[in-house]
């Protein structure tokens, strides 16, 4: 009996909606990363990009547990000498919550072409509305 491997041509991609309101940021990111990777499928193949599309709504209502709001720091570099900028997680969640969720999911994906392709299937929205109703996404409960 031989193992059947998943091929790109026979792949079906579904759409899922995750509501991040009142949910911890990390747990939401773990679920999204697993769906983007395709680990929830029975025929998951590690070397094939077999993940589904993920829509995360209400990113502005995601929560940070513990002291992470004040202690976690996001860094970026302007490119100039001494141009290291830092932003606390509380400020990041107030101003750019979708980017904070994007960084969390990106850190949980593989650092290769499969991870980069998976990030193109992630859609983030601050409010409860999204323009992907035509794809008929299924709700994923945490």
List each language-model region with its residue ranges.
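Ribosome large-subunit tunnel/peptidyl-transferase-proximal elements
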Residues: 1-103, 113, 131-142
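C-terminal structural segments of small proteins and small subunits
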Residues: 102, 109-131
């Amino acid at each position: 009996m031989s193992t059947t491997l998943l091929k790109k041509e026979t792949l079906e991609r579904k759409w899922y909606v995750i509501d991040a309101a009142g949910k911890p940021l990390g747990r939401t990111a773990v679920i999204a990363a697993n769906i983007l990777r395709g680990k929830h499928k029975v025929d998951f193949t590690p070397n094939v990009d077999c993940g589904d599309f993920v829509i995360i709504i209400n990113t502005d209502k995601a929560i940070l547990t513990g002291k992470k709001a004040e202690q976690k720091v996001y860094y970026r570099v302007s490119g100039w000498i001494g141009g290291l900028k830092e932003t606390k997680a509380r400020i990041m969640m107030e101003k750019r919550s979708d980017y904070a969720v994007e960084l969390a999911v990106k850190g949980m994906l593989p650092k290769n072409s499969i991870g980069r392709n998976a990030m193109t299937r992630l859609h983030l929205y601050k409010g409860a509305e999204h323009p992907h109703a035509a794809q008929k996404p299924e709700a994923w409960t945490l």
